[in-house]
UniProtKB/Swiss-Prot annotation:
GO terms for molecular function: phosphatidylinositol 3-kinase binding; signaling receptor binding. Disulfide bonds: none annotated. It is found in: Membrane. Residues 72-75 are annotated as: PIK3R1 binding site. Residues 57-79 are cytoplasmic. It comes from Sus scrofa (Pig). This is Hematopoietic cell signal transducer.
């Protein structure tokens, strides 16, 4: 169940949104289309690099044990 403060916040959110006038961004400049496209492309590239890094670091590796070089009489397949 949601805490009472969270419910109050959700109820007052539309009231707060109505108080904000559109275009009241202080110090914000308009984003040009090439800049916006570059930001989206850079975000996609960084996201792909993160996915590849997680895949490379997270995949299981088969490591040979130290006993692979030893030959035992009662172990078929090793010798």
């Amino acid at each position: 169940m949601a805490p009472p403060g969270g419910i109050l916040f959700l109820l007052l959110l539309p009231v707060a949104a109505a108080q904000v006038t559109s275009g009241s961004c202080s110090g914000c400049g308009p984003l040009s289309l090439p800049l916006l496209a570059g930001l989206v492309a850079a975000d996609a590239v960084v996201s792909l690099l993160i996915v590849v890094g997680v895949f490379v670091c997270g995949r299981p590796r088969s490591r040979p044990t130290q006993e692979d070089g030893k030959i035992y009489i009662n172990m078929p397949g090793r010798g």
